[in-house]
A protein has these predicted regions:
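Histidine-acidic metal/acid-base catalytic patches
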Residues: 1-34, 97-99, 123, 155-177, ...
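Active-site-proximal loop/turn and secondary-structure-junction residues that shape catalytic pockets
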Residues: 14-16, 42-44, 68-71, 107-109, ...
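Catalytic-core regions built around general acid/base machinery
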Residues: 50-58, 127-132, 195, 223-227
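N-terminal substrate-binding region of glycoside hydrolase catalytic domains
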Residues: 27-44, 66-71
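Conserved beta-strand positions in the central sheet of alpha/beta enzyme cores
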Residues: 39, 64-66, 102, 140, ...
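Short hydrophobic interaction/assembly module
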Residues: 52-80
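Glycine-rich, proline-tolerant flexible connector loops at the mouths of alpha/beta enzymes
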Residues: 39-57, 105, 112-113, 148-149, ...
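Active-site acidic/histidine proton-transfer and metal-coordination neighborhood
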Residues: 57, 76-174, 184
Length: 259
């Protein structure tokens, strides 16, 4: 991937956490050390005023954060609560300049068939697309690995994730493709994404084993990221890993490895 096209998004839940307690200072550090963007998970537990000021002060992009509430979308009973919360998340995304929200599917529910849960997901995401229409904000559903980090999670297949978001027929609904989770599940990027790069709204990377910085494990991250870029992905690369080295050094090394 050419350095000119590379935009690295530091997940400040983990990056710069050892260097700064508050998220505003982590934003400043990410900017100072060359990241083009930042991202985080939940927004309702953060000092949004200080984060907004740090984003304005540095000019760094906020690439994404998690849509709240984080409840099981596999349960139709949660639909109204999620959609109500989504409206607040969209307002916050527009305030902070983020164009992508991340959705978690939730756990595989006992007593409910997989098809029933999938139908609930599609129904809720379709309604979410209607809320997002015209807002400039999109929602990415994230498949996660169920072998190490998220045992019991419903959506562990990228192919199934793409099937679900395509079933909504909503252009505002896509996936977040996490290369680490995909690799843990034994997936090949080219095989599982195929001709659906338009449905990939955001990507995350980390190495395996350990979920640490690129170069610490065995995943051929450059090959996978290059394939995504060559097939049309032009968004930020989310650095969602637990750094073993200093965060600033891992950003520089990731840029070198991917470039």
């Amino acid at each position: 991937m050419s350095e000119a096209a590379m935009r690295l998004s530091a997940c400040i839940e983990w990056l710069f956490a050892a260097e700064a307690d508050n998220f505003a200072d982590r934003i400043r550090l990410a900017h100072a050390h060359g990241a083009e963007a930042v991202e985080f998970w939940k927004w309702t537990n953060k000092d949004i005023g200080s984060i907004e000021w740090a984003l304005t002060e540095t000019g760094i992009e906020l690439s994404s954060f998690v849509a709240e509430p984080m409840i099981a979308l596999t349960d139709r009973a949660n639909k109204d609560a999620f959609l109500k919360g989504l409206k607040g998340s969209v307002e916050m995304a527009r305030r902070l300049g983020a164009h992508t929200l991340i959705a978690q599917a939730g756990d595989d529910l006992p007593g409910k068939s997989r098809e029933e849960q999938k139908a609930a997901l599609i129904e809720t995401l379709t309604a979410a697309g209607e809320i997002l229409e015209g807002s400039g904000v999109r929602l990415g559903l994230e498949p996660l690995n169920t072998l190490i980090d998220h045992v019991g999670y419903f959506l562990h297949s990228t192919v199934e994730g793409i099937e679900i978001v395509k079933a909504t027929s909503r252009p505002e609904i896509g996936i977040v493709y996490d290369v680490y989770h995909s690799a843990v599940m034994g997936e090949d990027t080219a095989e599982v994404i195929g001709g659906n790069i338009d449905r990939v709204f955001h990507i995350h990377i980390a190495d395996h084993p350990g979920r640490n910085e690129p170069g610490s494990g065995d995943i051929d991250l450059r090959r996978r990221v290059d394939w995504l870029a060559e097939h049309g992905y032009g968004g930020a690369i989310g650095l969602e890993y637990r750094p073993l080295a200093a965060s600033a050094a891992t950003i520089a090394e990731t840029r070198r490895m991917l470039g």
